[in-house]
Regions:
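Residues that flank catalytic or metal-binding motifs in active/ligand-binding sites
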Residues: 30, 48-50, 105
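Long, amphipathic alpha-helical surface segments
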Residues: 1-21, 29, 37-40, 74, ...
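Surface-exposed patches in mature extracellular/periplasmic domains of secreted proteins
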Residues: 42-45, 94-106, 145-146
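Short, functionally critical alpha-helical segments immediately adjacent to catalytic or ligand/cofactor-binding
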Residues: 30-39, 108-113
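Aromatic-anchored, charged helix-turn/loop surface patch used as a conserved interaction hotspot
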Residues: 62, 68-100
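Substrate-binding/active-site groove segments that recognize
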Residues: 46-71
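Charged, low-complexity intrinsically disordered segments
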Residues: 99-126
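Short, mixed-charge amphipathic alpha-helical segments
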Residues: 16-27, 95-104
Length: 214
């Protein structure tokens, strides 16, 4: 997808969220984190779990399908609406987690809930405990412990791109899929999980968006 199209979509989602849910103070960089991991598709496709999906990884619900049967058009405006609603729902759920203490972790919790669902996220017990310690004291050591716990999961082996982008956000404070040499620089002598090392030391071309994303 071209940069201009990407910016237009992110801008539209940001505007909708900031207009309808200004109290959440969801930034464009948070929306970009979701977008950079998920990509965007203007057409319906079937995801790896068999769900009909469109836009920013929006899985069609029974209600969505009923509305489509009644004539709902899958134009850009509708896809932006779904994306905004999905992001807001996940961020709201992120803030209800007992391990949530500061907004520094909100995009990470939010995206994981967006991707895994509330129940799926609840299974990441050790990661959530490590995230709590990281929020209480944002040191490199605590950051590594948190990322190692996230890396120690089947999810991390399936979506190394997501692990890489989240790691960049935690360690750099920026949303990017770039090469992450800081992991080795910061944590020499530390035990880096193989999944985390694999995700952060791959060349960027390895992490191209799936072909169905346009």
């Amino acid at each position: 997808m071209g940069i201009d199209k990407r910016r237009l979509i992110i801008s539209a989602i940001t505007k909708r969220i900031q207009t309808h849910w200004p109290e959440l103070k969801i930034s464009g960089s948070t929306i970009y984190l979701y977008y950079l991991i998920e990509g965007w598709s203007d057409i319906l496709y079937t995801d790896t779990t068999g769900n009909q999906t469109i836009g920013l990884g929006h899985k069609l619900t029974a209600e969505d399908k009923l509305r489509l049967e009644k004539g709902l058009q899958l134009g850009r405006e509708q896809l932006v609406c779904w994306a905004a609603n999905d992001i807001v729902k996940s961020i709201n759920l992120a803030e209800t987690q007992p391990e949530y203490k500061s907004k520094v972790i909100r995009p990470v919790f939010g995206y994981l809930i967006f991707n895994l669902g509330h129940y799926g996220f609840s299974k990441f017990v050790k990661f959530r405990a490590a995230a709590l310690k990281f929020q209480e004291m944002t040191t490199d050591v605590n950051a590594l412990k948190m990322l190692n716990e996230l890396a120690d999961s089947k999810w991390a082996t399936q979506v190394p791109r997501a692990l890489r982008i989240i790691s960049n956000y935690v360690l750099r404070g920026e949303v990017t899929a770039n090469y992450l040499d800081e992991v080795d620089y910061h944590f020499k002598g530390e035990n880096i999980h193989p999944n985390l090392r694999e995700a952060t030391f791959r060349e960027p071309s390895y992490f191209n968006l799936p072909e169905h994303h346009s």
